[in-house]
Amino acid sequence: MEQRITLKDYAMRFGQTKTAKDLGVYQSAINKAIHAGRKIFLTINADGSVYAEEVKPFPSNKKTTA
């Protein structure tokens, strides 16, 4: 059964070091993403594997009129 959880909640539960290891990134990247308030969700699969997806508006860059 898949479980979906925010990056912040996963890191609070398991620690930033384990979170980084599970996602294949550095701990500093986890810390920076959390402090920046990025909307990142982790899916935990039944086999224990974890992957992350970021949700952000499209288009992400709002163009200003000149």
From Swiss-Prot:
The keyword Transcription is assigned to this record: yes
Gene3D superfamilies, per this entry? CRO Repressor
DNA-binding residue intervals:
16-35
List the molecular function annotations (GO) for this entry: core promoter sequence-specific DNA binding; DNA binding; protein homodimerization activity
User: Which GO biological process entries does UniProt record here?
Assistant: latency-replication decision; negative regulation of transcription by competitive promoter binding; negative regulation of viral transcription; release from viral latency; response to UV
Among Pfam families, the record links this protein to: Cro
- This protein's UniProt keywords: DNA-binding, Early protein, Latency-replication decision, Repressor, Transcription, Transcription regulation, Viral latency, Viral latency initiation and maintenance
Q: How does it assemble?
A: Binds DNA as a homodimer.
Job description of the protein: Plays an essential role in the switch from lysogenic to lytic state and in fine-tuning the lytic phase activation. Mediates the de-repression of the lytic promoters from repression by cI at an early stage of prophage induction. Turns down the expression of the transcriptional activator cII, a factor that initiates the expression of repressor cI, the major component promoting latency. Additionally, cro is able to directly bind to the promoter region of cI thereby preventing the transcription of cI repressor.
Tell me the protein's name: Regulatory protein cro
Q: What organism is listed for this UniProt entry?
A: Escherichia phage lambda
